[in-house]
Curated annotation (Swiss-Prot):
Domain spans labelled NACHT: 207-537
Organism whose genome encodes this protein: Ictalurus punctatus
Cystine bridges: none
Binding site for ATP: 213-220
PROSITE patterns reported in the protein's UniProt record: NACHT
Keywords from the named record: ATP-binding, Cytoplasm, Immunity, Innate immunity, Leucine-rich repeat, Nucleotide-binding, Repeat
Function: Probable regulator of the NF-kappa-B and type I interferon signaling pathways. May also regulate the type II interferon signaling pathway. Plays a role in homeostatic control of innate immunity and in antiviral defense mechanisms.
Encoding gene per record: nlrc5
Positions annotated as LRR repeat: 879-902, 904-925, 1002-1025, 1026-1048, 1103-1126, 1128-1155, 1212-1235, 1351-1374, 1387-1411, 1421-1443, 1447-1468, 1502-1525, 1532-1553, 1560-1580, 1588-1609, 1616-1637, 1642-1662, 1670-1691
InterPro entries assigned to the protein according to its UniProt record, in alphabetical order: Leu-rich_rpt, Leu-rich_rpt_Cys-con_subtyp, LRR_dom_sf, NACHT_NTPase, NLRP_HD2, P-loop_NTPase
Coiled coil among keywords: no
Protein family: Belongs to the NLRP family.
UniProt name for this protein: Protein NLRC5
Amino acid sequence: MKMEEMDLEEDVLDVVDQEASTIVDILCEQRDNVLQRIFALVDARTREQLQHLPNNRESISGLVDYFRTSDQHTCRRFLDIIWSFCENIPLELDIRIVNLAGSTAGALVNNSHVPDTENSPQSRYGKRARLDQVQSYTNAVKSFLQKKFEKVTKDIKKEVCLNNTWLCWRTQKYARVRDRPAKSQEGEEVSLEHKESVEALLMKTGRVVMLSGQAGSGKTLLMHCLAHHWAQGSYPSIELLFLLEFRQLNLISQPLSLKELLFRFFLPSDEDDEQSEAVLNYVLSNPEKICFIFDGYDEFGARFKDPKELECSVNPYQQLPLADLLSALCSAKILPGCTVLVTCRPRDVFDLFGSSDYFVAELLGFNQQRVKEYTQEYFQEKGCEIKERAVSLLMDSHHLLSMSHVPGLCHVCCVCLDHFLTSDMSQQPGTQLPTSLTQIYLHILSAFISRCHGCGSSDNHTPLLQRYRVQIAMLSKLAMDGLENSRIVFPANELTTELMNFGANAGILSRLDLTCGDGSRRLGCAFTHLTIQEFMAALHLMTNPDITESQLKKKLNLKSRWTAKTDPKTVFTDSLHLYMCGLAAEACTSNLVLLKGSENARAIVLKRQDAVLKTLQRFVVSGRQTGPKIIELCRCAHETQNIDLARAIGPRDRFELRNIRLNPVDIDALAFVISSANQMVCLDFGACYIEPECLNIIPNCKNLEELNFRSRKYDDKFAEALSGILPKLQSLKQLHFISGGLTNIGAAKLFKASECCPQITRLNVSDNYLTDESVKKITELFPKLAKLTSVILGKNNISINGIFILAGKMAAFPNIKEVYANAKKKEINVQFSANTTNSASTDDLNNTEESKQLILNDWNLKWTNVHNLCPMLRGCSSLTVLNLSHNALGNRGLKKLLEHLPTLDTIQEINVSDNGVDMDGVVLLSPLLCTLKDLTEVEASHNGKKMLVLTFSSSIIDALKQVTSEGCDILHKKLSLTHSDIHPTDMNKLCKNLIKCPNPLNLDFSHGTLKDESTEKLLKFLPNMASLNLLNLSHIQMSTDSALLLVQLLSDCQRTTTVELRQLGETFIKFLQDKSEAATCKFNQYRLSSANLAKLCEILEHCHHLTDLDLSSNFLKDEDVKTFVQFLPKLQISGSVSLNNNNLTEVGVLYLLSLMHTCERVAAVEVSLGKEEQQDIIGFVQKNCTGKTFRLSSCTVQSQNVLFLLNKLATLNSVQTLELRNNSFSADTIKYLITEFCGDCNHRTIRIMEPWIKGEAAVGLVQCCLELNPNIKEIRVEKTCLKLSVESLVSATIPNEWENGNCSLSAVHCISFDDCEVEGQHLSSLQSALRNCPSLQELHFSQLTMGADGAEFLSSVLPSLKNLKILSLSSKGETEDEAVIFALQHAQKHLEQLSLAHHVIKDRGAAVLGNALQGFTRMRSLSLLKCLDWTATGGRDLVRGLVQCHSLEEIRLDSIELDEESIDCFAQGLQAMTSLKKISLNKTISKEGSGVLCLLASLHPLIELEEIELIGLRMGDRGVEELVKHIPKWTRLRKINLSENRVSDHAGEMLVKALSHCRALQQIHLFRNNLGHSSAAVLGQVLPSLSELTELDLSENQMESKGCSSVCEALVSMKALKKLHLTSIGTSDLVNVASCLKHCTSIEDISLSWNNCENDVVLKLAEVLPQCSKLKRLDLEANNINTSGAMALATCLQFCPWIEVIRLWRNPIKKDDLILKDKRLNFSST
């Protein structure tokens, strides 16, 4: 409004009267000094009255009323002060005041308080002019915005109602999920929201708001509507509103200032630059009155800049890049306090940097009612019939309805329906509504073209798409060009006028007035919506001939809905891939062919459609997809309508969706995929925004088994909507509504709806806001859901009263098996037994009911609560566990609980741990343990304050009761009082009560403290405690004197059988019911003095039945040992004494050695002074004991004591066995020992181990020994150990040379060097000694390299060894020692055993060996192991000699090659070897593989056969058929090994049946064949008859589960079995095998490796292994055992000390847990 147009004589009083409310609002926001100036104009009396009103607003309102009735002069002064000093005066009021001041400028009172420059007429006239310019521009803006609104809404059918269009506010920013990889799918939850109408967006000013909405949600329309409402007078707090569109701003490339942005690109000033400057100054001076709306940030080509990268304050006149300028506006770097509204899509919200200075709102779509209303409005002019039909079609089509929740798509669906109904398509047979978004857009395209003006044609038979395919192709190319270059606006010069007119008339394009970067205007166009542009681009890709298949695939990729700052900015909706998928649908083929238009159009279209489908198939198999990409994949499949593709996506048991927005279209696509897959699935929604309309689509998901909702945003309203669909989910088994906003109201509706889901087994409503009322409601649900197994209610607001409601229902509903409530952990669970009908009836409840448990922890329960709880449980049959731990019962509560025990007749355990019970409570329980028949154990700790558990007998325990000879049941009882300080008075009370116990009793006082007085009290009662079995005092701080008092029990109490005392270690005393015949005493880890030791020995003197005494680890010194040695003859010990790990030196060793003289009953002394572990054991004479033994190891004797020790040993004539290990003895010392110790010619055995005894030194030592002592009978060197035995001449066989008086000859019978680094060159020194050994019968060389020197040695000594019968030569590796073979010619002809291993024998050597064998007429055993390198000729020469050895009883020819002629010769020779008992031909075969059958046929005469090994002969079924002819005759057969022979399942049956005749069998090895379940079935029948079988190996045969079951049946009776190997047998179901092992009482070695076994097998093993007391090794390599399974094994090992190793290689086990540190659990080969 201009000044010239204003009434200059406007009355001052009228202005105040008309603007009174506005003036009051202004004055309420002013400072006190301004109000004081105004109150100064009022008379004193009135001022006082006004200032005493109740509040400031009433005072100001009265003040304004005062001036409304004052005179003109006073009123003018009032307005003058307002204009001069008040802030935030609205523009129109400011203009009126200036006008009044200007009309009477000279009449104003001289205001000394106002500066002259401001109060001057010139200043007021200048301001009036500027305000006039601002008002003029404001009016122009309002007119401009109203015209734009009319243009935007010209085709809108329905009036836009801001008060009926809703948004929801987010109270915090969205979680940027992909910025945190560690939470890639869980993400943060978006916090609570609240709804508001869109008109509220501008009601509050001064804030930055991001309004997000999906493409097509109506953001642009609503922004124009808001601007229109402002222009009409709404939002009075906003003086100026600027609406800018990002699609226009995209055209700006150069930097610009705020002024240039407003007056070049929004609305240029109609007047000169002076007006622009005035408006800008007003904007800068009044930012709180300015509003900016930036529409379509998603269409902006750049990103907002982080405000941290901008300057603190940005100059509004400074030219900046557009993104920086807009970022400065949004972050208050420019115009702080102005209102900014930015519209965008949800993914773009993250681009607005900053803190809490901006708000996020989300535009909500249509609900079903709004969809219906819009559809009715759209078809209002079409007539009632079409309108009703359109509404009916839309509401009945869940595809169309799901799309219509987006307003833009709702409009699209209406256009589609309009075309469908008005073009008579609906009347054509077989015509259906489109079922995908792409198909709808194809209909839209046809609809747009059909209504295009000027497109008419006389050709009514040509389809529209074909008729205008050229124009469509050009528009499609334009769309694709824009898509590739991120352009949505096109200048008119980029397309022809005809094409623009066609597009605009059809509604595909919209014309635009574009403002260029220089401010000039020109015509342009854009597609009516981004989705239209993307659809047209997809048409281009599918129809343009220039597009290659490679280009097509590049455009097809899955989009994630999780966004990150690093994601590239795009202006499009990322729907191109969906339209491409939709166009690949079969239903779109004909339309694409029309648009293609070429001769081979169909072939090209089909090829491109196939390429799209194949690419999608690759996406399916490309690996694990995240939730957003799963949804996108489902959308793609839904668009294709391809069932096969949907089935490929569907096979997954769980669809996890986290932190994404889901709309009805998404759920519709998900339902399409899930319903196509033939399996049950789970839908898991975590913090996803789900529109209520989505829930109505979920019932379309067939096979839905589990439904999870997890987010605070899921509240009662959501639960109400969910309740509406639950009755439709008939296959639903699990419902989880957790971590939500559910209250009793929503829960009641949810529970009510759940009644209609008969399959529900699990209901989880934890972490909500439920109270006891909901508990009551959910218990009403229990009898109505017959299959319910679990209800979870934790983390709610449920009190103990609610818990008692659940506890009370345990009696009413028999199928409740557990109620668990832990207040500290906030867990409340109810478990139900399966397959039991829920019924409140309690009639005829029998013992078949499952046991029940009630667990109430950390509820601060007191004795009064127990008084209320127990009556509730009175009728609860089968209640076995009552756990009330971690409460506040105290002794009084415990007593109250015990009073109610008679009503709990099925109870097995009561846990009242951590309940404030003290020792008085424990004492209260002790008489009950004696008097209550069913109370079997009281387990308490820390004087009852921590653990306190009562255990009662049950049916299971009753079955294990011991039965006495009189037939009476004996129920064992136990009192555990651990970690307790038991005072003497308490000990006295306990023992007085327990002495009356009639049942066998165990007492456990471990880990506590016993003072001497308490120990004395205990000892006073122990002899009279007749029922006591065990007293456990482990880990108790006890004095040595108290410990000695306990030892006194061995003499004071004749029932004492074991006393084991360890300071702070395992300590216990065992008693028998009758007098003990034998007793053991262990007194360890005490620091015993000589006085203590003497006292102990004095006590033990009176124990006449002591068998073993262990004084290990008592810090005994040499002098203490001397004292003990003096006492030992007086002690009547019959077994052993252990002095391990004390502080002995070599002096102590001599004291112990003296026992051999002083105590005749001492049979053995073993001493080891090793650094790691000291061992000192004294053994006593047992029955059948001949001679004494002395063992000494790791004792480095000083040089002056060596001779003394050796002489001492030499005098011990009774010592027969002497073992000396690692004592640093030299060769001279050993020689001296051999001379002196063995000089008396008594029978002696000496073993000496020193690290230097090897190689040449070993040979030299043997030579010296033979020369020093001719009585040596046997001498061996094995590694570094020398072993020799000496016999007297009387017992030795006297050779002829001795009879002839040659006493220098040795009587040695056996010399052996085994793996001791001896080589042939070392043996020369032995020659002379061997020539003097005429009695030598055995000569062994193992693991050595003979060489030429060794061959020479053999050639030299063999002729002199007249009595040699056994010669063994095992080479170290495969070495060529042919000279050794030649040396064999010198051996005596009466040689009986010859063993050659790893020798390389060529033809000449084979011939020599063959000739030699012909002369060995007494040969009984021949072994040629891996002796290779002869040709066929050499092999024949060898075999010809071998077959002449008719007396052979054993042949081993492993891994040698024979040709067919040699095998034939060998086979013929075998028939003559009727004495043969053992034959091993492992992997011995001709290169051609023939001759096996001939060889097997030759075995028929060998009826004495005991062992046969034929590994790797590849005999196959024909070989087995031949073999089974002979096996029944081998009745003495003990071992058979036919591994690696390609035996089939059928042949295996024959073999096993034949073996049934061999009842002496001890070993069967059949690994790596082709046996199956048929062989196993026969084996299961035969094995029980083989009672002596010790080894069975069936590894690497595909026996599978059925065959395994057959073997299991036999295992039950195999008591002698020691070794069982079932490696890789084709089944993981080995639970039955594990279960049967308990029957194999002799088992030592088990292998179940490489079977992919699960934890169930391990758990069964853990249960069985404690019964396998001889097991040493268990192999479980390469299975599927996880950490929990390994922990079960580790726990089991604590009870199985006999097990040496369990191999767990190649299993998915994390070895972090301490329990897995047991060294016997082997996880790797290192």
